[in-house]
Amino acid sequence: MILERNRRCQLALLMIAILAAIAGQTDAQKAAKLTAVSTCASKEKCHTCIQTEGCAWCMQPDFKGQSRCYQNTSSLCPEEFAYSPITVEQILVNNKLTNQYKAELAAGGGGSAMSGSSSSSYSSSSSSSSFYSQSSSGSSSASGYEEYSAGEIVQIQPQSMRLALRVNEKHNIKISYSQAEGYPVDLYYLMDLSKSMEDDKAKLSTLGDKLSETMKRITNNFHLGFGSFVDKVLMPYVSTIPKKLEHPCENCKAPYGYQNHMPLNNNTESFSNEVKNATVSGNLDAPEGGFDAIMQAIACRSQIGWREQARRLLVFSTDAGFHYAGDGKLGGVIAPNDGECHLSPKGEYTHSTLQDYPSISQINQKVKDNAINIIFAVTASQLSVYEKLVEHIQGSSAAKLDNDSSNVVELVKEEYRKISSSVEMKDNATGDVKITYFSSCLSNGPEVQTSKCDNLKEGQQVSFTAQIQLLKCPEDPRDWTQTIHISPVGINEVMQIQLTMLCSCPCENPGSIGYQVQANSCSGHGTSMCGICNCDDSYFGNKCECSATDLTSKFANDTSCRADSTSTTDCSGRGHCVCGACECHKRPNPIEIISGKHCECDNFSCERNRNQLCSGPDHGTCECGRCKCKPGWTGSNCGCQESNDTCMPPGGGEICSGHGTCECGVCKCTVNDQGRFSGRHCEKCPTCSGRCQELKDCVQCQMYKTGELKNGDDCARNCTQFVPVGVEKVEIDETKDEQMCKFFDEDDCKFMFKYSEQGELHVYAQENKECPAKVFMLGIVMGVIAAIVLVGLAILLLWKLLTTIHDRREFARFEKERMNAKWDTGENPIYKQATSTFKNPMYAGK
């Protein structure tokens, strides 16, 4: 059979009527209605019609209108022939939350363990759907719920539902979550037992009892287990020299991949003994085979002892990096990791040398499938590596471990507090289904777009709104029915949604009242499907009235080829009339197509952006002269992002931090009395005073018992908006729009705190104030006096030293000059000798 080729788009007469009806409306309203009408009118098949938002299909046999696909707000079609499926929700299992049920029992209400469930079926005016026609066995099908079992823990409500959804329609589902008090905890400690971790093992064996006691104070339903790992017993990971294989280091056992020493159980006293008896080993390269151990610890659920209803914690302790997929090729292992359990009865990993290390994505998938929270307890040198790793593993965290693991108890306690005090909703929806979460968490304000709530306590209940939207129908009809799971991260409980996508019309299938073989309305030469003819071979035309072998009237003009009675041009001048139907011209470019009942549509004359039709193929497609945007894009040229995700602060909160509007995926910041906001998410305001002064007194009284409100009654009465969380050091995370506050109190001590307002107020204060050292006045006075005396003595001694040196130099010079002096022999000119001798010169000696 030849599918009819000439049911095209156009609605000229109808458009004139619509224009007259909405003459008093604004231009924007008129344009919106005309766009909707044109979009519907261009659809020629029932299934493409109902896959278009706001459209309905008329399967009236003698339909006189221009198009069977019309806007479903119109009354163009008799009700009994109109088909427009509606979105329907039916709750199947709706057990009450455990905390709520216990509260009702304690109050003596004796009410049902179930809240009411809704049940309905989608239908059209022409036919009813069989979506809910099947009956289920058991009480749940009869009443829409099941009785609550006293031994069952329920933390998410509802638990199961059915949903029939049309394309592009959004449906909101209310989800409630409450952490049950005393919820069971399974903690499996996975430790690196290479030689460098020997002191850590010794410390853990002494802290095992303390770890058990600490966790039992949190929940009395606590199981503890222990496993260890080294690396693959192959070069270059370990030395394969026979002697080294037996004793790779002093007091070491032979290397191994992974071993489960102690499955999870409530005999926590044996944990310390197992750790103490475990022997360290040695390897060659720096990274360890921890990923092999993680995969086996998660995949081997029964051998490890993971319970169905428990919060599952896997503490991974190491001081080194990790091998991942591909590293096994260095040792000649090319078979990829299959993600299955391969433990011997003794708990040893049997495929360590047969399979490669798992990839990060494999670890992440196993974590999601088994609701595991991994805590990477690593030394400071490796912390930055594992902080990047946790970004790719759902529900995981990284924390600093002391070099000897002495802080392991506090580390586990703090990480468990962080995990248990928050809830984040995740789902397994495919790319055809979009789920957006909204919640007000614990605040009384309006809901904001977020899938995570923090600072929860046991018993507190939060609600989420899951907005489900079917973006498009999958190409394979087998995918039109899917099961979607929504679950809190790290909790093995799911809300199951049995989704049926309304992508087809019953009248297109045999057995429907709208499906007639050799119908009279098709001249007896075709099958009527939803009111349109699917002609037999050799016949064509709107009613299969034309024969391919009879050419007498094949090219005769017909008024049905003209847009309206006033038009004198067939097929809008872009085609020719064949047997009362337009055959549109072909364009030189085969990608460019002219279409429509009167060739009035095309896919190349739409608005352009950046020289591309509808901003490019990734943003939208051109249909009948208008851009049809793909999911996530909007605007006349599909150039704007529909989602506000790019306007949401990374840490969550309000759109544009509550200080602007999101336009085309970009925040437009506002100016208020405080000042001008800026930044990518309008999170910065250099001129704003903030709330530091407002929060100061409450932080002082609650954290330090000082300040104007230090009186207990005053503090309790005035400080009800928040309770500050103590931290060792206050550091700002600019991505979360946090503000730093610093003050000095009456003791001249500096105290610091930070706050953020992402949906609700969070305050983090430094646990210890920074106070100046106390001044010892007597010591200062005595010190000054002593300093003066000592300085005086020093000056005197210095003066004495200098004078002595000077005198000695002078004396030495004097002595030197005296010793070197040469005196001439002379007589005193006034001295007279006692005797005088006179000699007569004339005397001759006689």
Swiss-Prot record:
- Residue intervals on the Cytoplasmic side: 799-846
Identify the main location: membrane
- Phenotype upon gene inactivation: In zygotic mutant embryos, midgut forms primary constrictions but fails to elongate and the visceral muscle does not flatten but remains attached to the midgut epithelium. Embryos lacking maternal and zygotic mys show a delay in midgut migration. Mutant larvae present an olfactory phenotype, showing reduced response to isoamyl acetate but normal response to ethyl acetate.
Which Cys pairs are S-S linked? 46-55, 249-252, 300-341, 441-453, 473-741, 507-530, 522-533, 535-544, 546-579, 561-577, 571-582, 584-599, 601-624, 606-622, 614-627, 629-638, 640-664, 647-662, 656-667, 669-682, 685-688, 692-701, 698-771, 719-749
Residues the record lists as Phosphotyrosine modifications: 831, 843
Membrane topology is: Single-pass type I membrane protein
Return one Gene Ontology term, BP aspect: axon guidance
- Which tissues does the record link to its expression? In ovaries, strongly expressed in follicle cells. In oocytes, expressed in the forming dorsal appendages (at protein level). Expressed in the embryonic dorsal cuticle, the larval eye and the wing imaginal disk. In testes, detected at the interface between somatic hub cells and cyst stem cells.
Question: Pfam families given for it?
Answer: EGF_2 (PF07974), EGF_integrin (PF23105), Integrin_b_cyt (PF08725), Integrin_B_tail (PF07965), Integrin_beta (PF00362)
Signal peptide (residue range): 1-28
Glycosylated position list:
72, 266, 277, 403, 428, 557, 603, 644, 718
Q: What result follows from mutating residue 843 to A?
A: No effect on lethality
Report the residue ranges that make up the I-EGF domain in this protein: 507-545, 546-600, 601-639, 640-683
This protein's UniProt keywords: Behavior, Cell adhesion, Cell membrane, Developmental protein, Disulfide bond, Flight, Glycoprotein, Integrin, Membrane, Olfaction, Phosphoprotein, Receptor, Repeat, Sensory transduction, Signal, Transmembrane, Transmembrane helix, Vision
The entry's localization annotation reads: Cell membrane; Apical cell membrane; Lateral cell membrane; Basal cell membrane
Q: Which residues lie on this side of the membrane: Extracellular?
A: 29-777
Describe the location of the VWFA domain by residue ranges.
186-419
- What is said about its interaction partners and assembly? Heterodimer of an alpha and a beta subunit. Beta-PS associates with either alpha-PS1, alpha-PS2, alpha-PS3, alpha-PS4 or alpha-PS5.
The UniProt family comment states: Belongs to the integrin beta chain family.
Describe the function of this protein: Integrin alpha-PS1/beta-PS is a receptor for laminin. Integrin alpha-PS2/beta-PS is a receptor for Tig, wb and Ten-m. Contributes to endodermal integrity and adhesion between the midgut epithelium and the surrounding visceral muscle. Essential for migration of the primordial midgut cells and for maintaining, but not establishing, cell polarity in the midgut epithelium. The two beta subunits mediate midgut migration by distinct mechanisms: beta-PS requires rhea/talin and Itgbn does not. Required for rhea/talin correct cellular localization in the midgut.
**By what name is this protein known?**
Integrin beta-PS
* Organism of origin: Drosophila melanogaster
Query: What's the name of its gene?
Result: mys
